[in-house]
Amino acid sequence: MSEKLKIVYRPLQELSPYAHNARTHSTEQVAQLVESIKQFGWTNPVLIDEKGEIIAGHGRVMAAEMLKMDSVPVIVLSGLTDEQKQR
């Protein structure tokens, strides 16, 4: 039986950006994410590896920092290669 995905909350200070993240976010995009989180809450958790490195959700983390949040919802993915993290 396969393990089910589990959403947990992690402190922002435990997360670090993925060094090879190819995507950038403009100030306008982050502002839109801030407004979305204010209006709808978290609808999409941040994906991180077992070391706390952000795989997907850099913009959401930036928005959370702007909102002065202490923690964010994450899904921890294990055993990914660098190639898989870049996709």
UniProtKB/Swiss-Prot annotation:
UniProt cross-references to InterPro entries, sorted A to Z:
Chromosome_partition/occlusion (IPR050336), ParB/Sulfiredoxin_dom (IPR003115), ParB/Sulfiredoxin_sf (IPR036086)
Q: Name one Pfam family in it.
A: ParBc
The family database entries (SUPFAM superfamilies) matched by this protein are listed as: ParB/Sulfiredoxin
Could you share any additional remarks the record makes about this protein? Encoded in the Rac prophage region.
Q: Know the name of this protein?
A: ParB-like nuclease domain-containing protein YnaK
Q: What is the lineage of its organism?
A: Bacteria, Pseudomonadati, Pseudomonadota, Gammaproteobacteria, Enterobacterales
What would be the name of the gene that encodes this protein?
A: ynaK
